[in-house]
Amino acid sequence: MKAGIVGLPNVGKSTLFNCLTNSKAQSANFPFCTIEPNVGVVNIPDTRLNRIVELIEPEKVVPNTVDIVDIAGLVKGASKGEGLGNQFLSNIRETNAIIHVLRCYQNENITHVEGSVDPLRDKEIVDFELQLKDLESLEKRKEKIIKHLKIGGNEYKKEFVFVEQLIEHLKKGLSLRNFNIDSESYEKYLKPLSLLTLKPVLYVCNIDEKLINNNDQ
């Protein structure tokens, strides 16, 4: 299992990575502090494993783990190669899940690439870039399917209809994880494409420390 930490530059991705993995990756007040992805490993607590260890007392215990990847920040136009866009999207493609960090605090001393703090806008920027990249991948696949259909590849008709539906879904500004996809279609058509917006997402809100114990905000 591999989870990638993503978000705009300078929102706290490397800080979260260090907290989760007990690492010391560079974290600084400027965009693209992270260029090459940092990778750390986190053990997964499992009470069932603890119980088994108590019963059989093995010589060695190997817990389940998750690889955490601190990925370079994304900016508008990443799907077209802006910033570190191509590298960013390639790194996400290699993960199984996304941890999306959103900056939710004000601090004049910490720059924001968009000039202001707006977590909903920031979320939409990342979502939009991932959707555009998936749209590009599906359009390329559609072109290949059409070539097969032109030479009598009737077995591609079902895939063509399916891909068309996904393209229309993305054009509405929706991610593919919100599209009802059966396991057979996923395994047959989508798994080889490793589409970005199919990956499950956990949103992490980076808030002001003063608000941590404030239940009213």
Where are these regions (language model features)?
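Poly-acidic low-complexity segments
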Residues: 43-46, 102-103, 107-121, 153-156, ...
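Flexible beta-alpha connector loops of hexameric P-loop NTPases
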Residues: 74-79, 115-129, 149-154, 210-212
